[in-house]
Amino acid sequence: MHDHTGFKERIDEVLVRLADEEERALLGLHAELSPLSEQLRRSLACGKRIRAAFLYWGWRATGQPDCEGVIRAAAAMELVHAAACTHDDIIDDSRMRHGQLTAHAAFAANGQRSTALAMILGDLLMGYAGHVFTSCGLPGAYLARTVPLWSTLLRETMAGEFLEVLRTEARADRAPLVAESLEVARFKTAKYTVERPLHLGGTLGGGSRALLEAFSGYGLPLGEAFQLRDDLLGTFGDPARTGKSNLDDLRDAKPTALLALTVAAAGPDDRRLLAKLVGNPELGEEEAAAVRELMERCGARQQVEDMIRERIGRAGAALDLAAMPAEARSALSGLAATAADRSL
């Protein structure tokens, strides 16, 4: 059985070493870069390392053995994620992640130009991702196979973020559509969280076209399920357990499937209530409770749960048909369960 805790510790070690190396390098340039190095370390300190795990098991699914080179390559996915989170938190003005201040909120707390400094940090993290991946120690011929995939991963991730911003701003003009919400989820989360890390690992390992197609059949529905669960956590989750606000998505009128289903099922009076409350940056807990009650009452929350269950089933069916070592299959099955069952 796969020991994810032990795997996570190995990824954490790579990231701690990177933070140590970059602290020395940055402070060697100038002492005033200390806040940047400190926030870099904080940005890499937390996380479940799910994206790293998918790259690793994409590699192992090709029959390749465990090695330190692929651990370092997998750690690069966590740098991509940290960069994306840093920029996403700026866009959403989210103040908390993993129970601590986000980068721009931490810079602001120190009286610094928070948005500008956090943008620089996000760019730096993305740059480190490429460095860690290309210096992982795997053969150059293996790495060369993945070059097109890196461009694809970054393009799709930015496309998802861009579309989400556009559709959040369009909220005042018309109700969100479920299909559009899922499209954003596919680009912003499903591909860069599951499918593309699997493709990177599989391509590094020399996997067949059939295996990579199986990864898509498993990864896309699983990634959508992951985002749908995240949407539920973003509204119904306990901040003490999730480490982030359960008001931000409602305040920002995020174009989630949960909101789209709620609007579609709501009657005229409830739609007026939603128009009044959702998108209000001053929304408080009492108003949020009224929105949550409506989401429960109209069946939107249960519909999202059903969508998650259906997608997990599709992912499992695709995994069952894929040819790969038993250990890799077992690990990917376990990761699917983790993505689906994250606690509220």
Task: Give the role of each language-model region.
Residues Q112-R113, I120-L138:
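A glycine/threonine-rich phosphate-anchoring loop and its flanking beta-alpha core
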Residues A289-L344:
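Short hairpin/turn module used for nucleic-acid contact or packing/dimerization
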Residues A53, P65-V80, A144-L149, L211-L222:
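Alpha-helical scaffolds flanking conserved acidic
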Residues L40, L44, A74-V80, W150-T157, ...:
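Short alpha-helical scaffolding segments that buttress acidic/His motifs in well-ordered protein cores
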Residues M1-A82, T86-G111, F162-A179, A240-R241, ...:
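Conserved N-terminal diphosphate/IPP-binding helix and adjacent helical/loop segment
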Residues A116-A118, A179-T189:
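A short glycine-threonine-serine/GTX helix/turn-capping micro-motif
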Residues F133-S151, L274-A275:
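Transmembrane helix-loop-helix
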Residues W57, A61, T86-A109, G130, ...:
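Acidic, Mg2+-coordinating active-site segments of isoprenoid diphosphate-utilizing enzymes
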